[in-house]
Amino acid sequence: MGIYFNPSNASFRQARNSMVYVDKTNLLNFLNRRLFTDDKCIALSHARRFGKSHAAGMIDAYYSLGCDSTKLFEDTKLASNADYKKHMNKYNVIHLDISSFWDDFKDNIIKKIQEYILDEFKKEFKNKIDFTKKFNVVLMSIYDITNIPFVIIIDEWDCIIRNSHDENLIHKYLQFLHSLFKSEESKSFLALAYITGILPIKKIKDESALNNFREYTMLKSKPITEYYGFTEDEVKNLCKQYDMDFDSTKAWYNGYLIDGMHMYNPNSVSMAMDRQDFDSYWKNTSSFASINTFITMNYAGLKDDIMAMLAGGIVRVNTNTFKNDFSTIASKDDALTALIHLGYLGYDSDRKKAFIPNYEVATAFEAALQTGEWSDIARAISTCDELLDETIEGNAERVSELIELAHDTYTSVLKYNDENSLSCVLTMAYFTAPAYYNIIREMPAGDRKSTRLNSSHRLESRMPSSA
């Protein structure tokens, strides 16, 4: 049992012991069907906190020779498959998190990755193998000795691609990946490859290290969509179990429409259930900085589209021009596509339209607006709670003043006196209202029912009905 070579099942055991656990073990059925096939290389690119690393820990526990996971899987959905034990703990597993190496070894990261794995190989195989040979040859030698194939798992595989501007380093890294996944030796020793990242695979000229991977993204993930994020039925069951209001949960954390499935942010839902409180659990400076980076880019129509989405609207996005690289953003569509992959926008692939998925993400946008050219918008949003209070108190004069302020602020970036702009103004004027009220855009004619404060924070979903 090692850290990188044949790891334990500690990660999956911890997940199973957590306060909130949702069974995603049927993902392993999908992977088992791809062992030793042309489809054995899987690339999963999803936003952070959507269960990529949890899945990697589960894959460790299932395939690794370094542990016995019989009891961990015996009461799971996977166990309903009669031969689910066929591949359990039968493979040599290598598991790497590239981001942890990047933090410590930027200058010689590839050398260090190999050193750390080779150290564990040496403990296991001692003088049986010539460890001075190329890394893929060493893997082949281990396979020759043991007759046990490898399952290779790489978390944050794209960390170097996203963070390095050194083309030579990127080239060497891709050569290293080629040795793992496309060399002649890998045709024998590799049973399965599972790599995760934030962005889809970047097409780099003259590089073919990863062109044999099957990609699953925030745009399209069939047939494994349901395994990354919580499905609506799973969230309903959690709400019953933890006595939490489903509609509020939906408004706060739903909105990711992937392959027609409504997917929820699993980390935030779990936190809300455990803490019995609806709040933004995506509060960190990196998320605010990421949003701010893209919404302040100087591309025609970008500010209008952001404003429309902040007000609950949807905008058309051409995702095909995005080069899967944050450093080559060249248009409004590229900027919005980047936000989709980062999880800050939802996307309807049928209609090819994007939207702010839920109230949690809306609050992250609110924080991101505090600097730069959006500061005037941020100042207007800061008056939303006051407007809400004055509306409740029936202070018509102050309400009129605040609505006028909102009108002057928001119509400066929208079509003045356009009907949709006026609707946008009212929505933005009451931007923080969803934290306290059910939001109903239009009441049916003659319906005199009032919208009331709900102490349980029961909210309507932000996802546009036309999405």
Locate each region found by the language model.
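Catalytic core segments in nucleotide and nucleic-acid processing enzymes
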Residues: 458, 462
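Short, well-ordered alpha-helical microsegments
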Residues: 203, 448-449
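Polybasic/polar functional segments that serve as interface/processing modules
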Residues: 464-466
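Short acidic loop-to-helix transition motifs that present clustered carboxylates
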Residues: 134, 444-448
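A short acidic/basic microdomain associated with nuclease active sites
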Residues: 429-445
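Conserved small/polar residues in nucleotide/adenosyl-binding loops
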Residues: 451-454
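Phosphate-binding site recognition
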Residues: 1-418, 433-437
